[in-house]
Amino acid sequence: MVYRRRRRSSTGTTYGSTRRRRSSGYRRRPGRPRTYRRSRSRSSTGRRSYRTRYY
């Protein structure tokens, strides 16, 4: 079923890509990842945001 996999919501984001990113990035434990990059970016407002990417 292609419709279930590529379900486009009203916001314009695809349901499939959101699930794939969540399972590969957030569910993986930072204990022993294959290769992960953690970038710390500070916006002009002063908010600190951490972004961890797993490969």
UniProtKB/Swiss-Prot annotation:
Its main location: virion. The keyword tRNA processing does not apply. Residues 18-41 have a biased composition (Basic residues). Residues 5-24 are annotated as: 2 X 6 AA repeats of R-R-R-R-S-S. It comes from the Viruses. Sequence repeats lie at residues 5-10, 19-24. Signal peptide: none annotated. Coiled coil: none annotated. Phosphorylated. The keyword Lipid biosynthesis does not apply. GO terms for cellular component: host cell cytoplasm; host cell nuclear matrix; viral nucleocapsid. Keywords: DNA-binding, Host cytoplasm, Late protein, Phosphoprotein, Repeat, Transcription, Transcription regulation, Viral nucleoprotein, Virion. Residues 1-55 are annotated as: Disordered. GO terms for molecular function: DNA binding. Interacts with protein AC132. Plays a role in viral DNA packaging and nucleocapsid assembly. Promotes viral gene transcription during the late stage of infection while it is non-essential for the basal level of viral gene transcription. This is DNA-binding protein.
